[in-house]
Amino acid sequence: NELYELCAENEIGMVLINSNEAKRTGDDSLEKMKEKANAEGYKMPYLMDEGHLVADAFGARTTPHVFMFDKNAMLAYRGSIDDNSEDKNQVTKHYLKDAINAMSKDETIDPNITRSIGCSIKRVAQ
């Protein structure tokens, strides 16, 4: 929610998209998504990517995998939220936060690409 608030302050939209198609009957079911959104106090839309079409179109490989676009709908940042997906207390680099701050000041985002870290997106055969 801290990142959502930072985006809102800078008139940047945010949406979460769940693309784990192969786990729809378990932890990534619509009901579990609603429970997580409520428990975490999400204020942004949390959407289900049916058939992982959005993930495939963007080339997303992991959860999370960030894609941030500028006001001209150009990809401005792609990659990880930060440098530690397992322990938020061990984070030393805040990639997305830095990218949001740079974008809000019309500064160059550096780095504008980082390696996405997290669990792989669970796709189904089509």
PLM segments and residue spans:
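Short, internal strand/loop/helix patches
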Residues: 33-70, 75-76
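Short secondary-structure transition/capping segments
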Residues: 9, 27-29, 57-61, 76, ...
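Structural microenvironment flanking redox-active thiols in thiol-disulfide oxidoreductases
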Residues: 1-38, 50-55
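Thiol-/selenol-based redox modules, centered on thioredoxin-like
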Residues: 68-126
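Extracytoplasmic/periplasmic, Sec-exported soluble proteins
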Residues: 25, 58, 88-92
